Every structure is written in C-alpha cells, then in structure tokens.
Amino acid sequence: MSPRSSTPELKERATVVCRQGQRVLLVARTASRWALPGGTIKSDELPLDAACRELREETGLIALELTYVFQFGGLTKLHHVFVADVPVHAKPQPGMEITRCRWFGHFEVNSLPTSVPTLQIVELLYNRSLVSAEDGSAGQITSPSDTPIE
C-alpha cells in the first residue's frame, strides 16, 4: 500500500490471449484453475516484453505478433492484455511451472474452473456480455490509447 492510501496498489500483469479462430489457449499449474498465459511484469520490463517472456516460458510459443488490446483491472491485478493469433502448425507445450496447455472453444471457458479475470477477458474479446464477479463488481477496462504502457 502507498503511505497516502489504504487501497492496495494493483500488481501489474501481462496477459496473453492466444487464439486459433474460435479457440483460446488456456494453461494451468498442477491442481490449479485454467488461466490465460501470462505473469508479473518485472520492474525493468515493458508489458510487451513481459508478455513475450511469459508466453515463451509457459507455452514455448515464440515469435508471435502480439497486439495490445486493453487494460483490465481486477480486484488485485491490472492486466495488460495482448492478443496473438497462433498459426495452426504451432504446438504449445507446457513449460516452467505450467503442467497443462490446452485449446478450448471460447464458449467453453465459462464452464471451466477459471479465475474471474480469465473468464471476463475471454468474454470481452469475443464480444460477449461482461459477467460480474462473485461480489457483484466487474473489472475495469481501459483502452491502450487511454493509458501509456511504459
């Protein structure tokens, strides 16, 4: 928390939505919920660099063109959300702490055990209505042009 505020600062995270048509790639650790690839942005990194690093570490996917689409503010994390259209020949493989890597139809995500931000980000990208969090709140969305990512 900052000394002037009782509100905790949001941790910044690079989140990547990998798409193949109507399918989205989700990853999971052992005995964990499914999630979008991504992770914490290091203090010396730009969000794009963190997104590339996390995607490579978690899925082995490299040299994909990532497009920054929006920021998504959850209760504890600020997600810098990127999209990558993955060629059919690319085969993601679990790496680092990830034990499962799997493609799902975007419509299947709401029936999977996922975090609220994962579900909301996928729904936003596929033009579906934004679902509310369990406490009734929804995430905050900011377009890249509203806030610099440096």
Kindly label every feature range from the protein language model.
Residues 72-108, 117-130:
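Active-site-adjacent beta-strand/loop module that shapes the phosphate/pyrophosphate-binding cleft
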Residues 11, 19, 63, 76-79:
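Short connector loops at helix/strand junctions that flank enzyme active sites
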Residues 61-72:
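A short coil-to-beta-strand element that immediately follows conserved catalytic motifs
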Residues 19-57:
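Conserved Nudix-box catalytic region and its N-terminal flanking loop in Nudix hydrolases
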Residues 117-150:
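Charged phosphate-binding loop/patch that engages nucleotide di/tri-phosphates or the phosphate backbone
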Residues 43-44, 94, 114:
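Residue-level signature of the cytosolic catalytic core of signaling kinases
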Residues 1-24:
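Conserved N-terminal beta-strand and adjoining loop/helix that marks the start
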Residues 41-42, 108-110:
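Short histidine/acidic/glycine/proline-rich micro-motifs that form metal-
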